[in-house]
């Protein structure tokens, strides 16, 4: 691993909570990234952090058994859906409202905690529309992130 290369946008089967998006098992995805010689990989499922614990445990297990894994970087993230403030099932207009996809990557444990909190808030505001669970992260979240709250 002389040159650093990280794959920063990857989905696992945990992304399938709302629709079928990926067949990647967490362990298989991480193992394959290592076998390809990547320096690390980010887990950025669709508005879920469910795979993070499994990913952390897998990498820790590999590091404990194999020195070659010591520099492999696991990056924890989330693909959020940014939308207008206060969007809900009553005021949602499929012709006007957009859910912009943004990738968030945690640089440390504080960042990972913030991502988990954002995901929780998004699910607290989620709603069903046209057989799809909408999981909004409101634009106003930018101020919260900048202020660290």
Predicted segments with their positions:
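Phosphodiester-processing cores and adjacent nucleic acid-binding clamps
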Residues: 1-149
